[in-house]
């Protein structure tokens, strides 16, 4: 579906646009007058605090059953109790499922469990991290933010997509929402010039570790993946989109920076210019459930409750084959799970 934007990718990536959005734009909440999610089921990853917890809260307000996907079950249970406050416990459906994105095995196990659901309508993939220090994932050798933010989420999307198709009720497809970031638009992504690309993320970053650049790169990889996936998967099967809530104070993302200067700076800046998690989560819910956006979200990017351009790299003429190249490398990486065969079964 061709989409016309009210701003160019370059202007969308600009600092002035960012500050205008942060200071002067407040995405409206969705209410049951807009959409009633009664009887529907949603998965929210990274749901034990911050944006994930608030997203779960808003979905519950719309009548949805919510599955909290968390790395530590005890924290998920604490979040569940918090969400139940002021609600009828008998009428509120909240489940806690373990999910550790640092482990492909955990992702596969989570998806297997999702097959047992009677229906699945929404998945908001909010879990992610940034690393102040460079660390590698022991099981795969990839730098941790690339493994968690990109590869594990790409695996989860791939495994969930056929479940959405099989659990589809009526004529309205479900939606998978991958959370992105403003930093995706600023990433230089110099690794794209390598051949192949993904193995470079198993090497030490040179000349020095740049956590903001690497975090942004992990997010732009996700944008490429969603763009390529939407070319191959029919919107009648499942809608796949990406979204960004902007800078939010109280986000769990800041936990890695605690005890470091960057953590202090992040907290100060987010307090000065950031939205509350309550406002930020509204964007996720719009991407996942706004009926006005509908099928137009497929393969697109939702910001401030509207469709906006992704990173300029997605549209750069010299990089038009980059998405296809990344796709093939990612399918190779996830071949152990039959990724290509799964996507082929969903091909338009």
From Swiss-Prot:
Report the InterPro entries cross-referenced here: NAD(P)-bd_dom_sf, SDR_fam
Please describe what happens when the gene is knocked out: Does not affect the production of flavoglaucin and congeners.
Determine the domain of life of the protein's source.
Eukaryota
> Which pathway does this polypeptide act in?
Secondary metabolite biosynthesis
A Pfam family cross-referenced in the UniProt record is adh_short
Record keywords, A-Z: NADP, Oxidoreductase
Gene Ontology terms for molecular function: oxidoreductase activity
Q: Record-annotated residues binding NADP(+)?
A: 51, 75, 100, 126, 215, 219
EC assignment: 1.1.1.-
Q: What is the active site of this protein?
A: 180, 215, 219
Summarizing the function annotation, the protein's role is: The PKS fogA releases the carboxylic acid (8E,10E,12E)-3,5,7-trihydroxytetradeca-8,10,12-trienoic acid as its product, as well as derivatives with one and two double bonds.
The similarity comment for this entry is: Belongs to the short-chain dehydrogenases/reductases (SDR) family.
What is the designated name of this protein? Short-chain dehydrogenase fogG
